[in-house]
Amino acid sequence: MNPVNDIIDSYSAIVYTHKTVGVDKLASHYLGWNEIKELSKYYDGEMAVLQTCNRIEIYLFSRNESSVNEILHYLNEVHNKVISTDATILRGEEAIKHLFEVASGIDSLSVGEYEILKQIKDAMRDSIKLGIGSRYIRALLERSLKVGRRVRLETGISRGKVGVYSLAVEFAKSRFGDILGKKIAILGAGEIGGKLALILHNEGATDVTIFNRTFERGRNLAIKYGYSYFPLDFSRLHNYDIIFSAIFYPEKVKAPEGTVVIDLGSPPVFEGSNVYTLKDLEELSKATLEERQREIERAESIIREGLEEFRKDCLNLVYDNFVSSFMSRVEETRKEEVERALKVLGDDGEETREVLEAMTRSMIKKIFSPMFQNLRRAVENNEINYINLATSLLTHGGISQDKTKEIKTEQEYKGRSSGDETDS
């Protein structure tokens, strides 16, 4: 028995990305907030959903082997079509390694992008908010963030212009040679629109207009960078050189002629021969990938070390689970014995109770603290055999708390019966 392997093997991932299903098809696989909320009720286990413009990934922790199939069944139902066959299923260390690669920016449309770290944080926040992200999913996501930060600190993978939004601006520059003096429109004032506005500002672009459905949000973003702003109105877009679109719209819109439209939506809103989408940015990303290959190799080495660190995280989880479970039993027994002592003494006064409470707590601390210190050292030194022995001996040989109570009650009953027979 290896408790760490047991934890590792309980992780899995359901993965859809621009690489595995394509950008166009990916657009029809996204989950809305209400659908994720419903999924959290449907699934009995820990889970986090990571969704970006180029991936939809569901990370699971469950000792139930059928959990992945349950999720896939739900995905088919909620999309009213079979999408389970498009999924890549990763299990155990393979799922963990994949998340570390994603967090490191080496499995991305734009190698080395920073945005993914925030997106993983958001996935963890949402998971906790929905009550489906407890200690195991949190441990996985937190370690992935540490690996991602270390990769960026110790390699040059994120040096220079990285990220889908930077790629979009670079793509526009490749079409015109320069964007200074060009008339530019940004559709959308959300996270993507905000990133584009910042990048364009840093590039020195000044003739930029923000279009947004919510007028106030568009105005606030425009004021921040000294840009113009209007409510979203497709009829106003004919005089622009470049349009960056970062919106969802239920209908397709014909792109204005003579304008370069870079549509980062999934699915894209605009159509026409002058429209460029995430699919087109992939080609630019491939060139970047070749340039960063040496940094990717260094990142992979850090990821391998991250996997070893995560095994230590799992050992700490074993320790915490053991201490929590064991001490809850000890505390229950302590309380029972205090009550029994008070009955024997025939004194339920506050002072007597306080003395017994303090004495029993002190005894427990003095008896078990050295043992837990040794167990902690065993965890730090990865001494699996010692940990297995301790957890087996000190958790009633693996018998559940309910079963322990049942045995205890039976023994007490037998003891009373035996006493009655002697008296007669």
Curated annotation (Swiss-Prot):
<feature type="binding site">
    <location>
        <position position="108"/>
    </location>
    <ligand>
        <name>substrate</name>
    </ligand>
</feature>
<feature type="site" description="Important for activity">
    <location>
        <position position="98"/>
    </location>
</feature>
<comment type="subunit">
    <text>Homodimer.</text>
</comment>
<dbReference type="Pfam" id="PF00745">
    <property type="entry name" value="GlutR_dimer"/>
</dbReference>
<comment type="pathway">
    <text>Porphyrin-containing compound metabolism; protoporphyrin-IX biosynthesis; 5-aminolevulinate from L-glutamyl-tRNA(Glu): step 1/2.</text>
</comment>
<feature type="compositionally biased region" description="Basic and acidic residues">
    <location>
        <begin position="402"/>
        <end position="424"/>
    </location>
</feature>
<dbReference type="InterPro" id="IPR036343">
    <property type="entry name" value="GluRdtase_N_sf"/>
</dbReference>
<feature type="active site" description="Nucleophile">
    <location>
        <position position="53"/>
    </location>
</feature>
<dbReference type="InterPro" id="IPR018214">
    <property type="entry name" value="GluRdtase_CS"/>
</dbReference>
<dbReference type="InterPro" id="IPR000343">
    <property type="entry name" value="4pyrrol_synth_GluRdtase"/>
</dbReference>
<keyword id="KW-0521">NADP</keyword>
<protein>
    <recommendedName>
        <fullName>Glutamyl-tRNA reductase</fullName>
        <ecNumber>1.2.1.70</ecNumber>
    </recommendedName>
</protein>
<dbReference type="InterPro" id="IPR036291">
    <property type="entry name" value="NAD(P)-bd_dom_sf"/>
</dbReference>
<dbReference type="InterPro" id="IPR036453">
    <property type="entry name" value="GluRdtase_dimer_dom_sf"/>
</dbReference>
<dbReference type="GO" id="GO:0008883">
    <property type="term" value="F:glutamyl-tRNA reductase activity"/>
</dbReference>
<dbReference type="Pfam" id="PF05201">
    <property type="entry name" value="GlutR_N"/>
</dbReference>
<feature type="binding site">
    <location>
        <begin position="188"/>
        <end position="193"/>
    </location>
    <ligand>
        <name>NADP(+)</name>
    </ligand>
</feature>
<keyword id="KW-0560">Oxidoreductase</keyword>
<dbReference type="InterPro" id="IPR015896">
    <property type="entry name" value="4pyrrol_synth_GluRdtase_dimer"/>
</dbReference>
<feature type="binding site">
    <location>
        <position position="119"/>
    </location>
    <ligand>
        <name>substrate</name>
    </ligand>
</feature>
<feature type="region of interest" description="Disordered">
    <location>
        <begin position="401"/>
        <end position="424"/>
    </location>
</feature>
<dbReference type="InterPro" id="IPR006151">
    <property type="entry name" value="Shikm_DH/Glu-tRNA_Rdtase"/>
</dbReference>
<dbReference type="GO" id="GO:0019353">
    <property type="term" value="P:protoporphyrinogen IX biosynthetic process from glutamate"/>
</dbReference>
<dbReference type="InterPro" id="IPR015895">
    <property type="entry name" value="4pyrrol_synth_GluRdtase_N"/>
</dbReference>
<comment type="function">
    <text>Catalyzes the NADPH-dependent reduction of glutamyl-tRNA(Glu) to glutamate 1-semialdehyde (GSA).</text>
</comment>
<feature type="binding site">
    <location>
        <begin position="113"/>
        <end position="115"/>
    </location>
    <ligand>
        <name>substrate</name>
    </ligand>
</feature>
<keyword id="KW-0627">Porphyrin biosynthesis</keyword>
<feature type="binding site">
    <location>
        <begin position="52"/>
        <end position="55"/>
    </location>
    <ligand>
        <name>substrate</name>
    </ligand>
</feature>
<dbReference type="Pfam" id="PF01488">
    <property type="entry name" value="Shikimate_DH"/>
</dbReference>
<comment type="similarity">
    <text>Belongs to the glutamyl-tRNA reductase family.</text>
</comment>
<dbReference type="GO" id="GO:0050661">
    <property type="term" value="F:NADP binding"/>
</dbReference>
